[in-house]
């Protein structure tokens, strides 16, 4: 009991550090008491479940924490009277600009020094007819990617930009249907072609639709879009678009889509956006995809990997070529996993290293017991005291630069709601669990803090109520710059070496 009381007290201290009860310092109000009690309740629930919790030892909060500098880089305009719901930041080196999207529809370009922010395109503009569905926290303009030949005149990919967007327009016939659910809305992959890639604003015509998904439920609808940045012209991998397609939502994958090889849901797909051998003729299915002509019957040829729940982010290691994905778990396990062609990451037979039983239960027996599955390299428990009630893995980037030596050779990832950022070795990949995870804190000139604490301080300066969650994402810029985005204060931040921060 004494140890549990110590754990509770430490959790309160951590809550003050990470911003969960930032307003309570020196101000014993009803709001303060309520927040403290909420933290205590969360901790008590966590401690009560330690006998069945796969991660009974919490992530180290202080001793092993890595501290780096952080500064404000750029401000993105509000939309609908609220902070921009920033989702993704992408470097487009051909035009020497960063691009960041707001889930409500706008896509902004940001100069490399952060001083110029320009709306490049607005997917929600009536004349495009996209009808962006962004009424709920998970829906909207999900992701985007520039073709690697975007700024190369005379090539087939010149001027081409791809977006993945939820839409309320469900009239067109979908290419992929879930076979159940409530037909919540559709998610569409669109191709936009600008005439002048270096122009300040998009000057092309209406988008071309490549793929349309009928969504069974209102969450887990999108994912990430990216071209492999390590591929070169002439290589078979060059110009192939990877797309994270979540399991369609509700909870527990009730339609069993992630393990269904006839379904596009719960998968990482790989297509040739400039090809035409798909069923609808609007994109290509690469001949080297793992399930093409592999004797798997009616398995979809678009599938690159299966068994994912909500693959929000994936990236490649510039040194090893490894592809890693941050996949959001159900109610117990968050994970980061290696992805290879044909890999089965387990969902919904497995949640992380543990057999999935129900939305709130996994089995601790026979951990990592199926040799056919690809299990996480790291995973963490949603009940960890550092986190909020809801957790969601995000990231993920491999930092191979030396500008910030504390981060060199680390895989960086984070937890979306809490704003916690973590790292683990990219050279000595763990084999599951959370023991290898290091917490990362940020110093803006006033001591180490979490991203949520930084957001709350900014909210107060903006005259707003402090946010209770971060909704944080990471982005990678030129020369391996690491950017931090969120949906709560409109600020893009960039990591810097310690000592480069002005208080």
For each of these PLM feature ranges, what is it?
Residues 49-252, 313-316, 321-329, 389-428, ...:
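Acidic, Gly/Ser/Thr-rich repeat motifs that build Ca2+-stabilized beta-propeller blades
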Residues 59-80, 115-135, 192-216, 267-307, ...:
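Blade-edge beta-strand/turn elements of extracellular beta-propeller
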């Amino acid at each position: 009991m004494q140890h549990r009381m110590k754990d509770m007290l430490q959790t309160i201290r951590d809550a003050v550090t990470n911003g969960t009860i930032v307003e309570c310092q020196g101000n014993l109000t009803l709001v303060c008491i309520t927040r403290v009690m909420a933290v205590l309740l969360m901790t008590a629930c966590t401690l009560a479940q330690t006998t069945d919790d796969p991660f009974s030892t919490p992530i180290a909060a202080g001793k092993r924490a890595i501290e780096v500098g952080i500064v404000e880089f750029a401000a993105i305009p509000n939309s609908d009277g609220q902070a921009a719901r920033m989702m993704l930041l992408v470097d487009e080196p051909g035009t020497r600009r960063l691009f960041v999207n707001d889930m409500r529809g706008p896509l902004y370009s940001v100069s490399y020094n952060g001083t110029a922010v320009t709306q490049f395109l607005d997917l929600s503009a009536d004349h495009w007819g996209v009808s962006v569905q962004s009424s709920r926290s998970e829906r909207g303009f999900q992701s985007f990617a520039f073709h690697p030949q975007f700024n190369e005149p005379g090539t087939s990919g010149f001027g081409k930009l791809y977006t993945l967007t939820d839409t309320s327009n469900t009239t067109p016939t979908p290419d992929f249907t879930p076979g159940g659910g409530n037909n919540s809305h559709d998610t569409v992959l669109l191709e936009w072609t600008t005439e002048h890639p270096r122009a300040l604003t998009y000057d092309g015509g209406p988008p071309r639709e490549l793929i349309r998904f009928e969504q069974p439920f209102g969450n887990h609808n999108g994912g990430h879009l990216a071209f492999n940045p390590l591929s070169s012209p002439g290589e078979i991998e060059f110009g192939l678009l990877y797309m994270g397609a979540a399991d369609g939502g509700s909870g527990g994958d009730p339609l069993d889509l992630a393990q269904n090889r006839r379904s596009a849901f719960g998968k990482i797909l790989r297509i040739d956006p400039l090809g035409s051998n798909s069923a609808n003729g609007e994109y290509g299915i690469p001949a080297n995809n793992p399930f093409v002509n592999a004797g798997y019957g009616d398995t979809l040829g678009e599938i690159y990997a299966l068994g994912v729940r909500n693959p929000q982010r994936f990236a490649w290691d510039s040194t090893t070529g490894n592809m890693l994905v941050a996949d959001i778990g159900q109610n117990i396990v968050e994970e980061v996993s290696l992805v290879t062609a044909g890999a089965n990451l387990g969902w919904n037979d497995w949640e992380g290293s543990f057999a999935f039983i129900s939305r709130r239960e996994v089995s601790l027996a026979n951990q990592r017991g199926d040799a056919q599955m690809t299990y996480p390299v790291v995973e963490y428990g949603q009940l960890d005291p550092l986190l909020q009630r809801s957790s969601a893995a995000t990231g993920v980037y491999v930092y191979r630069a030396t500008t910030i030596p504390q981060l060199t050779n680390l895989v960086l990832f984070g937890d979306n709601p809490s704003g916690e950022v973590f790292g683990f070795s990219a050279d000595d990949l763990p084999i599951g669990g959370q023991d290898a995870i290091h917490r990362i804190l940020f110093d803006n000139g006033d001591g180490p803090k979490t991203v949520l604490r930084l957001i709350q301080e900014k909210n107060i300066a903006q005259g707003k109520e402090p946010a209770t969650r971060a909704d944080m994402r990471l982005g990678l810029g030129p020369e391996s710059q690491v950017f931090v985005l969120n949906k709560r204060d409109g600020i893009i931040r960039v990591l810097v070496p310690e000592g480069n921060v002005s208080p």
